[in-house]
């Protein structure tokens, strides 16, 4: 239970960083492999 409690306490920060990482990875994949890359990835 102690491990679960510690994980529950650590999740907010880890989730926010995890979302940023996965978001950037997804955007890179979309830019590389999607036909919408011109629309989504142009500055």
Curated annotation (Swiss-Prot):
Residues 1-21 form the signal peptide. There is a cross-link at residues 24-31, 34-41 (Lanthionine (Ser-Cys)). Maturation involves the enzymatic conversion of Ser into dehydrated AA and the formation of thioether bonds with cysteine. This is followed by membrane translocation and cleavage of the modified precursor. Keywords: Signal, Thioether bond. The modification 2,3-didehydroalanine (Ser) is found at residues 27, 37. Belongs to the lanthionine-containing morphogen protein family. NCBIfam families: lanthi_III_b, SapB_AmfS_lanti. This is Lanthionine-containing peptide SapB. It comes from Streptomyces griseus. The gene is ramS.
